[in-house]
Regions:
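Short, solvent-exposed alpha-helical surface patches in non-cytosolic proteins
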Residues: 179-251
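Active-site-proximal helix/loop segments of hydrolytic enzymes
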Residues: 2-5, 11-15, 21-179
Length: 251
């Protein structure tokens, strides 16, 4: 079982250009999503956020991490944006891990100023025993990018996990819809619309569920992502339903 140590930013003072949030809050959510994805894929994961970098490196070493993974967001001039990943040198295991993550994360993020660079002087890169891929997801001082980062923490975490799986040569296992995936934290109108839409889709037969739950009943939980095949199937069922209704009206 491969071991990954996740070190999300603890920089609460780095406020976002939109969304009334900060780097620590968003990166904590990204790190948690990444941990959940990696554990689902069979990795042993330790995550430490609100401790000094020296403590993080010591715990990473004690854990026996095979990859040290700081997760941050960046800032510069309010205009530049894109994924930046840093490692010890542009060769070796740290670079391989950085490249594997970069290859899946950079196409996802909004920005285009993207690269992998060597920064052996950075504390966690220099002091952690494990190869380190230091991820700067994108730039939070650009308002539209800040909004995107805040809205997509789960997808970002999953994507970083995909890159880690690629680096270790392990299969990435996508999340399966289940009841635990979909708690509604607050009774918002959006949540109510979602529940109404699900009930309607089940009643009309637009969705047939994703496998079965432990009790044998269909699993109607929402999934994080919908494939094109699933979307077209749902639209086809909807169109067929309209045709049936139109036929009944003409009779």
């Amino acid at each position: 079982m491969h071991k990954v140590f996740i070190s999300p930013s603890d920089q609460r003072r780095n406020t976002y250009a939109s969304g009334n949030t900060n780097e620590a809050e968003v990166c904590g959510r990204i790190g948690a999503a990444c941990r959940a994805a990696l554990e689902r894929c069979g990795f042993a994961v330790e995550l430490v956020q609100y401790e000094p970098m020296s403590s993080k490196c010591a715990k990473s070493d004690a854990f026996g991490a095979e990859l040290h993974l700081p997760i941050h967001t960046n800032a510069f001039n309010g205009k530049t944006s894109g994924t930046r990943i840093m490692c010890y040198a542009l060769s070796g295991e740290g670079y391989k891990a950085a490249k594997a993550i970069f290859d899946v994360l950079a196409p996802l993020t909004p920005g285009t100023s993207e690269n992998i660079t060597a920064h052996p002087e950075l504390y966690e890169i220099k002091n952690a025993n494990a190869p380190t891929a230091y991820v700067e997801v994108d730039f939070h001082d650009v308002p539209e990018v800040a909004a995107w980062l805040t809205a997509n923490t789960e997808t970002i975490g999953e994507t970083i996990a995909k890159g880690v799986c690629k680096y270790f040569g392990e299969a990435y296992i996508p999340a399966c819809g289940n009841k635990a995936d979909e708690p509604i934290a607050q009774p918002t109108r959006v949540g109510a619309w979602s529940a109404e839409a699900r009930a309607w889709a089940i009643e009309t037969g637009l969705i047939n569920g994703i496998g079965q739950l432990d009790d044998g009943t269909p699993n109607y939980a929402w999934e994080a992502h919908v494939t094109r095949e699933q979307l077209v199937t749902i639209l086809h069922r909807f169109a067929q339903g309209i045709k049936r209704e139109e036929s009944s009206w003409s009779m």
